[in-house]
């Protein structure tokens, strides 16, 4: 059985051939738009598909057709291939064009995408710092009491026996009053001199004056 009606043996430039080619171009364009809208491809992929479709067909878009026309054309071409075992020129053109388009899409999808300004960066958790050990505040006394030091204190440590023997030759101890919070040596020296003057003028020194 030969079904010659699947092929159109007309000359180039005839109106029927131009109409048929324009329908094929519409088919490729429509299929390209379906693929572009049905997948999550970027704008470049859609542009490449359109360029590949137009380059593969090389014809102008004149005739409008719908999804029903696409289904009918697919069925007719399938029946023609099954009966004659020879695909028509339009099917070969479609296969070549779609192969090129799919290769282009695969190369685009496999290539790393440029960073988009709408992309939300992943929030990386900040590294946890070790807890800082806080020392309790130091409790200060309300008012430090003045300490009384001996004038000959801090002149070197002597043994117990030496200290007992030299006690007779030592001059009498003079008390030295340290003011709280005072670290100035000049002020301390001035206070010591005033105490000595008082001891010289008072009868019996400070101890004798206190015993009166």
Curated annotation (Swiss-Prot):
Ranges where the record places region Disordered: 119-184
Domain of life: Viruses
Record key words, sorted: Early protein
Name of the featured protein: Probable protein E4
Biased composition (Basic residues): 138-148
């Amino acid at each position: 059985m030969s079904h010659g009606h699947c092929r159109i043996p007309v000359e180039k430039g005839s109106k029927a051939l131009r109409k048929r080619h324009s329908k094929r171009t519409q088919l490729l364009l429509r299929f390209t738009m379906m693929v572009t809208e049905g997948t999550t491809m970027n704008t470049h992929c859609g542009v490449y598909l359109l360029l590949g479709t137009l380059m593969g067909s090389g014809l102008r878009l004149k005739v409008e057709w719908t999804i029903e026309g696409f289904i009918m054309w697919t069925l007719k071409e399938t029946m023609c291939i099954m009966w004659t075992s020879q695909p028509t020129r339009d099917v070969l053109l479609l296969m070549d064009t779609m192969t090129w388009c799919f290769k282009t899409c695969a190369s685009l999808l496999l290539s790393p995408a440029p960073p988009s300004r709408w992309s939300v960066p992943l929030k990386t958790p900040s590294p946890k710092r070790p807890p800082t050990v806080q020392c309790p505040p130091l409790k200060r006394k309300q008012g430090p009491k003045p300490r009384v030091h001996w004038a000959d204190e801090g002149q070197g440590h002597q043994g117990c026996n030496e200290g007992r023997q030299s006690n007779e030759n030592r001059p009498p101890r003079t008390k030295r009053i340290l003011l709280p919070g005072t670290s100035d040596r000049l002020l301390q020296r001035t206070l010591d001199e005033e105490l000595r003057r008082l001891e010289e003028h008072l009868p019996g020194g400070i101890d004798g004056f206190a015993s009166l």
